Amino acid sequence: MKKSYSPYSKFPVGVAGLVNDGRIVSGCNVENASYGLTLCAECSMVSNLAMTGGGRILAVVCVDKNGELLSPCGRCRQLLFEHGGKELQLLTPDGPQPMSVILPWGFGPDDLPQ
């Protein structure tokens, strides 16, 4: 959370993901004065995943500065679906939930023609 760059919203977000090879990858939000360019924590986590060898994300937890669970925005749900699939588990206030519940009609690589 200390690495979050959130001078505008004052709302730091941190995320961690378990990768299929046992690694933990993390990320934080990085804001921009042009708000549309802000990167969500999940975006930096997926970048971290790619930079450290790739793999599939098995489980994710996203929290605010107090450790309260947060729900990813729609863009980030799609990003998590791409890198973890329907089986990825997201920690929610109701316990772990698969992406198939969080994003029931997710669009992914299997939906594209070969």
Per-region residue spans from a language model:
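A general structural signal for well-ordered alpha-helical segments in protein cores
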Residues: E42-V46, C73
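Short beta-strand scaffold segments in enzyme catalytic cores
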Residues: Y8-V19
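C-terminal binding/interaction regions
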Residues: M1-S6, T52-Q114
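Basic DNA-binding helix
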Residues: L49
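Histidine- and/or cysteine-centered catalytic micro-motif in compact active-site loops
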Residues: L18-N20, N29-V30
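Compact, glycine-rich, soluble single-domain proteins
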Residues: N29-C43
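Gly/Ser/Thr-rich helix-start
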Residues: V15, C28, L37, R75
